[in-house]
Amino acid sequence: MAAAAPGSGAAREEEGTGGDAATPQPPAPTSAPGARLSRLPLARVKALVKADPDVTLAGQEAIFILARAAELFVETIAKDAYCCAQQGKRKTLQRRDLDNAIEAVDEFAFLEGTLD
C-alpha cells in the first residue's frame, strides 16, 4: 500500500470510521430558508408572531431570526440556571434555579417577577 501524502486525508480513510462516528455532522442544506437551522418549529414561531395584533406581515427571514434568538435566549438562561443548580450540588434544574439566575444576571432583570 502506498504512503499517503501529508494532509491528503487518505490516512484518515484507512483508519476506518471509528473516529468519525463520534463527530457530529452538520445537517445537509435544503432549499427551504432556515430549514434544519432552527430547533424551534418555524410554523409555531410564525403563529406566535401573527398572534400579535400589531404585526401585519412577517417575512420568513424575520421568523427564522426570531426563532434563532429565542433558541439562544433559552440556551443562555438554561446554562445560567444549571450553574445555580450545580452550586446547590444538584443536576436537576428547579424553579428556584431559574429565579436565582434571573436575580444574578442583569440581562434577565426584565424577567423578575414573571415566575410568580
From Swiss-Prot:
It holds the Pfam family CBFD_NFYB_HMF. It is found in: Nucleus. InterPro entries: CBFA_NFYB_domain, Histone-fold, Transcr_DNA_Rep_Reg. One of its GO terms (biological process) is DNA-templated DNA replication. Keywords: DNA-binding, Nucleus. The gene is POLE4. GO terms for molecular function: DNA binding; protein heterodimerization activity. Component of the DNA polymerase epsilon complex consisting of four subunits: the catalytic subunit POLE and the accessory subunits POLE2, POLE3 and POLE4. Interaction with POLE3 is a prerequisite for further binding with POLE and POLE2. Accessory component of the DNA polymerase epsilon complex. Participates in DNA repair and in chromosomal DNA replication. Gene3D superfamilies: Histone, subunit A. Residues 1-36 are annotated as: Disordered. Its main location: nucleus. Residues 1-10 have a biased composition (Low complexity). The keyword DNA-binding applies. The keyword Transcription regulation does not apply. This is DNA polymerase epsilon subunit 4. GO terms for cellular component: ATAC complex; epsilon DNA polymerase complex; nucleoplasm; nucleus.
